Amino acid sequence: TVLGVLAGAGIFNGVTKYVAQYHDNPQQLRRVVGTSSAMVLGFSTLMALVFVLAAAPISQGLFGNTDYQGLVRLVALVQMGIAWGNLLLALMKGFRDAAGNALSLIVGSLIGVFAYYVSYRLGGYEGALLGLALIPALVVIPAVIMLIKRGAIPLSYLKPSWDNGLAGQLSKFTLMALITSVTLPVAYIMMRKLLAAQYSWDEVGIWQGVSSISDAYLQFITASFSVYLLPTLSRLTEKRDITREVVKSLKFVLPAVAAASFTVWLLRDFAIWLLLSNKFTAMRDLFAWQLVGDVLKVGAYVFGYLVIAKASLRFYILAEVSQFTLLMVFAHWLIPAHGALGAAQAYMATYIVYFSLCCGVFLLWRRRA
């Protein structure tokens, strides 16, 4: 994930936005695709040089020794495939090609799993690590084929070019990606440390268990957001049309996630037995709190994609900082009182308040002249 963000300069949501916005303007679309290609090529090449030239310190930092310099240099090449694969997927999302995007991911993952197995058999532990990077990188193969077959854009559009205005707009998404990679991950690290200090690492494991199940099904549910919601909102310019789309999305998303969450709650004992072990049975008491938070978190995602679609860096930073602050405030209040249960309660309380704030800000924006 980190490689994908850094190699592609974090611009993929921006690519989807501007492709959707200019899908019926060939001249502007060519500028978007060409500038995106140049940025991806530049950042991925820079990453490759850093990995090749600094292989020894990177190996030391990641593995505690310098024995993996060869692996680091191979990953320097593989990350270029990750970047280009993500760029091609972002282009398809801009055209709302859900089928092409899904097929590319499925076929690419199957090829990647085979490559992982071969790498593991040939290289053991180092081969397995390389194989993990190959899985997302090899998506580039079916993505290229799918883009050619769909014919949405000529491959000549991918020739790197440069437009200062577009590069500046896309750079906003680089900042967004960097902010996202810092705020919530740091908040969760701090929550884990607080929980371990107040109680034990066993409590951390209980909370992490329910969080991992939550993340798994939420990824499945929100996968369609970047394929449908982001390009759709990017194409809309009238406040009335945007409002209608947001309300329609909320009317679909909230009941769907509530139904999925209720199903997970009903099957919580089976999920613990299937995915974890009897040591995690205490986790069952956390599900209700976590799942309520999940429903409202996904509801807030709808507003988040509106912010991304309009490339509003100011509101994006405000949203990320708000989530971080709310998590920290509720965590320091509830974790000392209730342990792992308090962590789940802090998560739920955060997204009750955050979703309410999103609704309030949206209503104010809608009523502005």
Task: Give the residues covered by each predicted segment.
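Membrane-water interface segments that mark the loop-to-transmembrane alpha-helix transition
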Residues: G8-A56, G70-L71, K239-S261
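Interhelical loop/hinge segments that connect adjacent transmembrane helices in multipass membrane
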Residues: A128, L132, A143-V186, L236-R244, ...
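Interfacial segments at transmembrane-helix termini and the short loops linking adjacent helices
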Residues: A55-V75, W201, V247, L266-V295, ...
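Hydrophobic alpha-helical transmembrane segments
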Residues: Q69, R73, A102-G151, V321-L326, ...
